[in-house]
A protein has these predicted regions:
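Alpha-helix C-terminal capping segments
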Residues: 24, 102, 199-202
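Surface-exposed alpha-helical segments enriched in charged/polar residues
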Residues: 97-100, 104, 157, 177
């Protein structure tokens, strides 16, 4: 039996931050400063303020004015993007179906997600697919985020999993590299269809 540990954003929940910003701040999108530019400026590859928000060491109220000051966006514009995130994080049904199929075949299922506390709370309240998992770890609850090695150690202890029979699925290469370095098996998620055949072989 394999333990399969899933990421959420971009894997089980839709997460396209460039499209989110384009929808929320269309007046900011120009030929020179397109959605990808604003995604990079806003989120800084999750290493800036949003990364601290993910890690549970910065509140939304603290984060919003800092992003505004750094990017030149208005505070209300930054807040509008933040407010639009919950609607973006909707289940990817093909991915959820894969989780359900693994559960039905008897595999142990957990999640390991970088997620700010308000969004983690909302996901727990609103997403029925969480019932498919035995347990999970949100970065904001433990004050550590991927790809820090400590979060993989913590997750392994919390889940009681054997690295040799643990498969981690995530959409960020640096997180995959960190999981492999920890001794887990790991696969980069590029879409439900791409990984479905591999999961059927478990």
């Amino acid at each position: 039996m394999t333990t399969v540990i899933w990421d959420f954003g971009g894997v089980l929940l839709r997460w396209d931050p460039a499209a989110l910003i384009a929808r929320t701040l269309p007046h900011r999108i120009t030929d020179e400063l397109g959605p990808q530019h604003w995604k990079e400026q806003f989120f800084l590859s999750y290493r800036g303020e949003w990364g601290e928000y993910d890690r549970g060491v910065m509140t939304e109220a603290e984060m919003v004015p800092l992003i505004a000051k750094r990017t030149g966006l208005q505070v209300r514009e930054v807040q509008a993007v933040v407010d639009a995130v919950p609607a973006e994080l909707q289940p990817i049904e093909q991915s959820v179906a894969l989780v359900r199929a693994l559960r039905d075949r008897g595999h142990r299922l957990h999640y390991l997600s970088n997620m700010p506390a308000p969004l983690a709370d909302r996901i727990e309240r609103e997403q029925p697919f969480l019932q498919l998992f035995e347990s999970g770890v949100f970065s904001s609850r433990v004050k550590i985020s991927k790809p820090a090695p400590a979060i993989f150690t913590l997750a392994e202890q919390a889940f009681g999993c054997d690295p040799a029979t643990t498969l981690f699925i995530d959409d960020h290469p640096e997180n995959i590299e960190a999981a492999l370095a920890h001794g887990w098996q790991a696969r980069l998620f590029t879409g439900a269809d791409a990984i479905a055949a591999e999961l059927r072989q478990l």
